[in-house]
Amino acid sequence: MSALLSESDLNDFISPALACVKPTQVSGGKKDNVNMNGEYEVSTEPDQLEKVSITLSDCLACSGCITSSEEILLSSQSHSVFLKNWGKLSQQQDKFLVVSVSPQCRLSLAQYYGLTLEAADLCLMNFFQKHFQCKYVVGTEMGRIISISKTVEKIIAHKKQKENTGADRKPLLSAVCPGFLIYTEKTKPQLAPMLLNVKSPQQITGSLIRATFESLAIARESFYHLSLMPCFDKKLEASRPESLGDGIDCVITPREIVTMLQELNLDFKSFLTEDTSLYGRLSPPGWDPRVHWASNLGGTCGGYAYQYVTAVQRLHPGSQMIVLEGRNSDIVEYRLLHDDRIIAAASELSGFRNIQNLVRKLTSGSGSERKRNITALRKRRTGPKANSREMAAVAAATADPYHSDYIEVNACPGACMNGGGLLNGEQNSLKRKQLVQTLNKRHGEELAMVDPLTLGPKLEEAAARPLSLEYVFAPVKQAVEKDLVSVGSTW
């Protein structure tokens, strides 16, 4: 290993850049302090440069770095911004606070404070209710359910269209991870047509909250929505132009929650309570706490890949789903077999190294290899025994995400349970991986599971107004192909 490369350089997840590289135009140049005779004028006062203002919108439109300058993030999306803004708004009687919390953040806080998930939930709700007079606290599962339902619907329709037209069989790519979405838009615009255009649970939750209050004749200006998310790129996601109408005012992480408690001289555990009625009392009208505080099968990032294959399996009685592991723990494929055919496949792929391989595979034009191999196997079949051998061979294969119908992509290795905003930043690589495994296990044991395929259409239909469910992709054209441009950020 090179002396210039250390283990600390291999953290392989998106973090804010240390400096902004956005080029800015300076009006006028510096005046020369030299007179007509060539003499230096020492009496001339130095010019004062204008202060440059750069916003999150500038970051989203700039291709200088992958995410954003940390300074820019903190200036508009941080716990300090929340405290300042809500401190002013709370003085107005017609304003109220709404908080949404992702399941990854709930589990991270529970693990950090040594609590059960329910105890941590109640503690968090009690804290926001008592200290900030918060009116509603919700989980993000309802937003995730609709996101999954729309994703599955679009994948099935896209696959049918490809089969009818014989179009390119390259997979669709998820856009729910803002790190991967921003990376694609800024450095790999050729992949933008492959992005499946469905918003993330964070944004759809915001849209649902806004729709709920509009149905009650409550103006958007009457509430402040704070979102608790596992990574810093969620701040950028909430600042996308098409996301501004989703009703999310500020995004913070569990790390910022802990910092905020310290600054306020508050002990999180001092808000412990056994009052489970908080789940219902802090739910908006029409929001069932058994749903929005739940989760679903398929993984801690959403389970989009798993749920798609499950949906196709329900359409084909007798089909069999198998789970295939990839070359590393950050690749998994869900493959659906029926008779001698693979009728559906979807994969999960995490970490920037795997994303780099994904980009190379999808831009090399080798998208039909597996199809040819399966056809060859089918032609060699001579009877039931051969068919059984073929099925066994397919089942024994390793994950092949590049030939899936859909790939659920996450920038962080270990996916969302390893988000940069979670309470795991001080762990070494081995302990960090063990912590992710622990949190994944707790996710399956402590959260109730609901069926997004059944609930999704019902929730969307029940919404008081049409929801904002799609992004407006903005790929940045590159004069020169870039593989990675990041300032102060090691992947």
From Swiss-Prot:
Keywords: 4Fe-4S, Iron, Iron-sulfur, Metal-binding. One of its GO terms (biological process) is iron-sulfur cluster assembly. [4Fe-4S] cluster 1 binds at C20, C59, C62, C65. The keyword 4Fe-4S applies. It holds the Pfam family Fe_hyd_lg_C. [4Fe-4S] cluster 2 binds at C177, C231, C412, C416. Belongs to the NARF family. Interacts with CIA1. This is Cytosolic Fe-S cluster assembly factor NAR1. It comes from Saccharomyces cerevisiae (strain YJM789) (Baker's yeast).
